[in-house]
Amino acid sequence: MSKIIGIDLGTTNSCVAVLEGGEPKVIPNPEGGRTTPSVVAFKNGERLVGEVAKRQAITNPNTIISIKRHMGTDYKVQIEGKEYTPQQISAMILQYLKSYAEAYLGEPVTRAVITVPAYFNDAQRQATKDAGRIAGLEVERIINEPTAAALAYGLDKMDEDQTILVYDLGGGTFDVSILELGDGVFEVKATAGDNHLGGDDFDQVIIDYLVEEFKKEHGIDLSKDKMALQRLKDAAEKAKKELSGVMQTQISLPFISANENGPLHLEMTLTRAKFEELSAHLVERTMGPVRQALKDAGLTPADIDKVILVGGSTRIPAVQEAIKKEIGKEPHKGVNPDEVVAIGAAIQGGVIAGDVKDVVLLDVTPLSLGIETMGGVFTKLIERNTTIPTSKSQIFTTAADNQTAVDIHVLQGERPMAADNKTLGRFQLTDIPPAPRGVPQIEVTFDIDANGIVHVRAKDLGTNKEQSITIKSSSGLSEEEIQRMIKEAEENAEADRKRKEEVELRNEADHLIFTTEKTLKELEGKVDEADVKKAQEAKDALKAALDGKDIEDIRAKKNALQEVVQQLSVKLYEQAAKQAQAQQSEGKKDDNVVDAEFEEVKEDK
């Protein structure tokens, strides 16, 4: 049975972990980093993922960042004349994580637990699951990020009862969840959040400030210059991180622009106080969901035993101060905010595989679910913060006489009117026998599985006719599209493998040419001239093949040269052996003479 890996698929960074010998371990990427930037780039037909993609983002407009913000929408990325969905881009990141997890474990990996923000709706969860499938992973479970963090924190504290608040501020999303821990049960009491608030927004306020200051000084708007903007983004992110440890930082961007007098440089000092002033409204925005979650759970700040901080953005001192002030407790610093979610996902993988015993995870649905009823009203069937998996039925009837079909419009959200909520899907129940309005009885049942994915069915109780759907949002992919994308992803992986093989082959060939030249120099005058000429010709043939694109030709010429060099080496060794033998026999004669002299000396004595 292959191992189940845990993946934190983040907006800015992703992380992968696995359970080994009962202990969760974060798997480092090929560069040695424990997290991998969620960045994909395309360059000359080649695909770059992670650190290498992030490094060249400034100069390459075909670089995609923060794709997670578009999951569950019909957003498309146009690159080199081809269209990509957010699911495909996310799948490329997942494929990369999968590949280095396989290299680390030394076996194929096909199963994963992937985390999502607790506040992700059904379309976003479905898109994440599809991304996993495209990457060649069987997604065993979609788990909420704060819940995963609580699992990682609480696994070794199962004997104590406590109420914990997980404050998760990532690169692009914000979640807060309140959980009760006790006797191995992790029960989510309430969850709230904002899917469009995160570290990217903190970077943005610094960028806006730098653009504004530069405009005041030089009259040039840097936000119109794509390359300057990418440099500003990198500088803003760096400044934000530095201000978590120091009180002020220097931002220096030489040659950021130019006017008629020559090049212009951006030199600025940013203090922590100024950054806090610029981002105060963002910090305050995170407090709304905190209060909402407490209210939904029926708790006061005094009832919270521990505050767990998750996500790189929680390193910002103003964020820590705000949550401390709100809850009245110092946040717990015992977990790594960048890795804890992936570790929790790996533990959940262990629970599914049966390697972790006595752990029960009870999560909740973040948003209410229901259908549109007469007058455009949103009628809730399942309230938010209901423990999942769950099922709920309600009986509805027709709105007009002799109505033979009903449209079921499935929605998710908290607003009273249907139009203000998120449409998850629509389907129709037909062939209802004509009857006066109010007579037919139509039972609508909602099921939410452990992944938070919704299944709905409607049944006419008179005829027992039933119609059901697993929600596929307007942005959802059809089975054909998923299969096509899986095939493309496999082909890309194959192309990547071939490209890697080609690079390795070219390197080996280069190295062989170098060693052959060295060997031929050493062999001058020691072996037959015809043999040297043969090796020289084979070497030149390989050099010529390297200039071409025919991989099989390079391989054949490399093997031919290797054979010639081997034969040369054998001949060299044979000659060396003959010489050594000749010297040995000469030496033996000399030895006899020496012995004789030595004996004579003895006799004289």
UniProtKB/Swiss-Prot annotation:
InterPro entries registered for this protein in UniProt: ATPase_NBD (IPR043129), Chaperone_DnaK (IPR012725), Heat_shock_70_CS (IPR018181), HSP70_C_sf (IPR029048), HSP70_peptide-bd_sf (IPR029047), Hsp_70_fam (IPR013126)
Region (Disordered): 575-605
Composition-biased stretches (Low complexity): 575-584
GO MF entry, a single one: ATP binding
Keyword ATP-binding belongs to the record: yes
Compositional bias of kind Acidic residues: 593-605
Phosphothreonine, modified sites: T173
Induction behaviour: By stress conditions e.g. heat shock.
Keyword set, alphabetical order: ATP-binding, Chaperone, Nucleotide-binding, Phosphoprotein, Stress response
Function: Acts as a chaperone.
Family the UniProt entry places it in: Belongs to the heat shock protein 70 family.
Protein name: Chaperone protein DnaK
